Design a protein with these regions (language model features):
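Mature N-terminal segment immediately following signal peptide/propeptide cleavage
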Residues: 31, 35-64
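A short acidic-to-branched-hydrophobic micro-motif
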Residues: 53, 65-71, 137, 275-277
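Charge-rich, well-structured scaffold segments of protease-associated domains
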Residues: 3, 22-25, 46, 102-248, ...
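Bacterial Sec-dependent N-terminal signal peptides
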Residues: 1-24
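An aromatic/glycine/proline-enriched structural segment found at the starts
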Residues: 23-32, 219-284
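Short, solvent-exposed loop/turn segments at the edges of secondary structure
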Residues: 61-63, 81, 116-118, 172, ...
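M16/MPP (pitrilysin/insulinase) zinc-metallopeptidase core fold and M16-derived inactive scaffolds
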Residues: 67-127, 190, 304-319, 331
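Solvent-exposed loop/turn segments at secondary-structure junctions
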Residues: 59-61, 72-76, 97, 127-130, ...
Length: 379
């Protein structure tokens, strides 16, 4: 390295250090302009069987994503809870036209991804393999190969998973929260057990598929390096054979809040921490006038690391690693507000007091202007 080069490097470094020293770190930097977001306007069409197709062309990268969504209302499974889960596990294991092994091998060979659940499917691939991926997705969705052998395997997996959760505090807490909020006669309140899974037969899975995995309530969203006319042609080719069916019409009791504050305890002798949740039923819809205001209020209360309950219970009191709240919305009916925290057993009562205090404060006292401004900027 020459002396001249050394001087240049030294001067550059010195200039950078000097410039950095001139920055006033006590003043928050002014935000730059908001980024321009262009989501793309979808083009759409419907098949005769009821399948609704949305297409967004984006040719920036040579890839494409497909989302098949079955938009059913919540389904009450009763003493056969686990049927939907087993149905989802058995979908995507090949089809009546291709074995599971050949199906998985081809997807791997294409460097693609294809996943199924009882509520639809998701695929992603390079755009040059788009046609074949749509064909594989449609074939597995329309012609599932439900066999007793695979059913028994998936049933054993599900039961093993349930057994592993029997002493997991967070899993038990989640079940109890839903059961208390919605009641066991509501789809969100029931939960799967080993007994309910053992009640499920292969015939139940086949019946669930026929009744609920139907195109009448289905959407196929295609986004990426595709052409609208090509998507339309391929969809008509591969999805037209999906049998038209009447969409399910379901009814069940609507959950309501308890008239007074109710305290429920579950003794877990193996637990080294207490899991606390304060919850209630809310009937929030995205179409509500105060929807955004409600989301902002929850963000201030417990939506992040700088939220009120986290600053109180973690930063001030040192009770926990994190305390948060969530606010649900559901077009099919009531959902939940929940504020949750895991704390040392010895500070359980104090944590409950602080949670209730923060919830009371945000309900009774106006939010400070600066707090609201900061939350809006972060949201």
């Amino acid at each position: 390295m020459t002396m001249k080069t050394t001087y240049i490097l030294f001067l550059t470094l010195f200039s950078a250090i000097t410039l950095q020293a001139q920055v006033d770190r006590s003043v928050m930097p002014t935000p730059g302009p908001a980024p321009e977001i262009n989501l793309g306007e979808p083009q759409s069409f419907n098949l005769n069987n009821g399948l609704k197709v949305l297409v967004v062309e984006n040719h920036k990268l040579p890839r494409v994503s497909m989302q098949l969504s079955i938009d059913n209302p919540p389904i009450l499974e009763g003493d056969k809870a686990g049927t939907a889960s087993l149905t989802g596990s058995l979908l995507g294991l090949g089809s009546k036209n291709i074995t599971k092994e050949a199906f998985n091998e081809e997807i791997d060979f294409l460097g693609a991804r294809l996943y199924f659940s009882s509520q639809g499917a998701y695929a992603q691939s390079l755009s040059k393999y788009f046609s074949r991926m749509m064909e594989l997705m449609a074939d597995a969705a329309i012609n599932p190969n439900f066999t007793q052998e695979e059913f028994d395997k998936e049933k054993d997996k599900l039961i093993t998973g349930l057994k592993s959760e029997e002493k997991v505090v967070s899993s038990i807490s989640s079940r109890i929260q839903r059961a208390l909020a919605y009641g066991k006669n509501h789809p969100y309140g029931e939960f799967t057990t080993e007994a309910t899974v053992n009640n499920v037969t292969l015939g139940d899975v086949e019946e669930f598929y026929r009744e609920y995995f139907v195109p009448a309530n289905a959407y196929l969203i295609v986004i990426g390096d595709v052409n609208f006319e090509e998507v339309k042609t391929l969809t008509e080719t591969y999805f037209t054979s999906w049998t038209k069916a009447v969409p399910p019409s379901l009814s069940y009791s609507q959950p309501k809040n308890v008239p007074n504050t109710q305290i429920n305890f579950v003794d877990m002798p193996n637990a080294v921490q207490s899991e606390i949740t304060v919850q209630n039923i809310v009937n929030l819809k995205m179409s509500d006038d105060d929807y955004i205001a409600a989301l902002l209020a929850n963000q201030i209360l417990g939506g992040g690391s700088d939220s009120r309950i986290n600053l109180n219970l973690r930063e001030d009191k040192g009770y926990t690693y994190g305390a948060y709240s969530s606010l649900g919305n559901d077009k099919y009916g009531p959902s939940r507000f929940a504020a949750s925290v895991e704390v040392r057993n010895t500070v359980t009562d104090s944590s409950v007091v602080q949670l209730l205090k923060e919830i009371e404060l945000i309900n009774t006292q106006p939010v400070k202007d600066e707090e609201l401004k900061t939350t809006k900027a972060l949201y």
